[in-house]
UniProtKB/Swiss-Prot annotation:
The alpha subunit is responsible for the aldol cleavage of indoleglycerol phosphate to indole and glyceraldehyde 3-phosphate. Tetramer of two alpha and two beta chains. PANTHER family: TRYPTOPHAN SYNTHASE ALPHA CHAIN, CHLOROPLASTIC (PTHR43406:SF1), TRYPTOPHAN SYNTHASE, ALPHA CHAIN (PTHR43406). Belongs to the TrpA family. Pathway: Amino-acid biosynthesis; L-tryptophan biosynthesis; L-tryptophan from chorismate: step 5/5. This is Tryptophan synthase alpha chain. Keywords: Amino-acid biosynthesis, Aromatic amino acid biosynthesis, Lyase, Tryptophan biosynthesis. It comes from the Bacteria.
Amino acid sequence: MSRFETQFATLNAKNEGAFVPFVTLCDPTFDRSFEIICTLVDNGADALELGFPFSDPLLDGPVIQAANNRALTAGHSSEDSLKLLEKVRSKYPEIPISLLLCANLIFAKGLDAFYQRCAEVGVDAVLVADIPLLAKGDYVQTAKKHGIQPVFICPPNADEKTIQGVAKNSEGYTYLVSRAGVTSAENQAHAANLDTLVEKLKAHNAPPILQGFGIAQPEQVKEALSLGTAGAISGSATVKIIERNLDNHEQCLAELAEFVQTMKAATK
């Protein structure tokens, strides 16, 4: 079994959902980012979703765009992010790790070379945010060749064909988007049809569903689980803690620890 499959099986046995924080790698620096990620795992994160710094992110709202800019301004490259991933994997051999990134970052390195490096540093899954199902072919094939699980997004306006395609092609987990738009901790409105989408994804045997976008409070984690999802992903709310504590790293780590503990408690 993959790390994601093992983790979901473990959580199911305990009747728990998954809490998965997102942060941008190398934000604000390589060393601080490593300490931040360690804090997330040590305080209860069930898996990690991590982003590479990129100057033109597709789905990212202002909070995560600012995180990208901080890492880029500090001079960090995609190779730095890969080295950081390797360091994280070395310390945490069991934690499932997924990447959320844009296709240009993969193109820059070359499809085969990128997925090969992901495998070398211990990445489990990759979600390419701007690759539609219709263009999935080479990505899915190359990912699987290197033992990387491809993940796809199910948008709130997905039709039957899209739902079926997402369910069929996703491995590890399925990313259910709460609403249209970009990531934000402020916009916590969710589409009204999420329960129907969850039912349909399950009917097509989709891998465990994680709900993302606008997950900032424990109540929203509980709400996601009540819809039948396997857990929730929180990006902007996590990164906002980093943003407001740039001048006080110890305070940043303390707030992140409390946040993860609180969000994880909501999965039980």
